[in-house]
Amino acid sequence: MIQRNIRQLVQYGLQTGLITEADKIYTTNRLLELFRLDELEECSEEVSMSVDELEAVLAQMMDYAYAQGIMTENSIVYRDLFDTKIMSMLVPRPSEVISEFETRYEKSPMEATDYFYKLSQDTDYIRRYRIKKDQKWVAATKYGNLDITINLSKPEKDPKAIAAAKTAKQSGYPKCLLCMENEGYAGRVNHPARQNHRVIPVVINGSRWGFQYSPYVYYNEHCIVFNSQHIPMKIEHDTFCKLFDFVKQFPHYFVGSNADLPIVGGSILSHDHFQGGHYEFAMARAQVERTFTVKGFEDVEAGIVNWPMSVIRISAADSGRLVALADVILSAWRGYSDEAAFIFAETDGEPHNTITPIARKRGEKFELDLVLRNNITTEEHPLGVYHPHANLHHIKKENIGLIEVMGLAVLPARLKDEMEKLEEAILSGADLRKDELLEKHADWVEEFLPRYPQINKDTLMDIIHTEIGNVFMQVLEDSGVYKRNEEGQAAFDRFIESLNC
């Protein structure tokens, strides 16, 4: 079987364009070496392999490797390390990938990113077969259609691997998952293998950055743009310059940055990076509901967006004017307090106000969304006042970062099983409060069920999905510093007025 698998994988490389006919013998010999084989057996049978067969062929190869003692452990962590090593035999060198990207970029930026995105999938850096497992649906709300996904593509670590990670030697190389040094890295039990990972160098605002795709692809062409230096996230004047520099180079992509403070920031604050992609989020589709003008920037369109979070949208043909106005708004917000609205710029010397910025090109104009954030905590809300409140934690407890802000819920994998069990329990009339797993959902279910007269096997999961969408809408409303009521919007207007003082 391993002989056939090797032939299949080489054929896969040829079919996807990862290797050429000139690479065929070389690649075959590298795979023979990996599996400790001395020769390729004679075979008259023609082999072929589709993209859909990759998962199964790699699984067979790993089963063989484990049986032969080539792979010492057989859990998901070790299998991921080894199948990445297998795929590395097919992946072009970084210089070849960069050269091909640059050649295509001369024709069009979109052709270049199309090539790189396909490559990132063909190399199995983006595991198509795992991404397919994610549960996705669209939830209609008063703010438009929100995207909901239950993330199932990140494998759960088994107890043995978790224990091994605890006792493994702690390494500072690479410093984090976003560092340049990940390219080609073999990985270890507490750090993923990246031999099949490639990075495109880009110059952003005069400094060296890298461009890659997220292996988890939460939306179409989900890319990460990261500083070549391991330096912390910081929202400042240069951030806006960098965002627009990227958009000018890749005008079909949006790009945004997580905020630079805990709670309201992303999961990696230690390494300066942006996220972007070829996708239109619900927030980008949301309309400006009222406009305003900032003195000295009469040439810039500005307004408040109809969105559950507090978003200022500015637009102009000259990106430099947007950078200048964004700088004014950021500076004003950093130092802004409004006790009546429970907005405090700092407490005990700890800063609370920051911004989540998102840049895009729309037609002939550049556009920048500035989402106002505040990370203050209280005894009542120890995880954050402007963070999902406790009554929503049964669905979403994690930080609300850039992706969620724009209208895509990334929900924990536990919800798949919980929602399936919840469906069974509701249909059978079981007492949710007596079920340890489902008890946390009881108040929620009791609140929404009376609204639906037709509850049956055919309708219930759709109802649950709709209500998860409503919870996510509330999550975003909780995270908004200015609430979507008369009092909250009056407070928002006070901040806008302060820009002209």
Label the predicted regions.
Residues 1-225, 229-232, 306-308, 322-326, ...:
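Active-site microenvironments that recognize anionic phosphate/pyrophosphate groups
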Residues 196-198, 230-255:
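Helical scaffold of the NTase/Pol beta-like nucleotidyltransferase catalytic core
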Residues 227, 273-274:
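Generic structural signal marking isolated hydrophobic packing positions
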Residues 238, 247-270, 276-337:
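Catalytic or ion-translocation cores adjacent to nucleophile or general acid/base/metal-coordination motifs
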Residues 262-263, 274, 398, 404:
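Generic detector of intrinsically disordered, low-complexity, polar/charged segments
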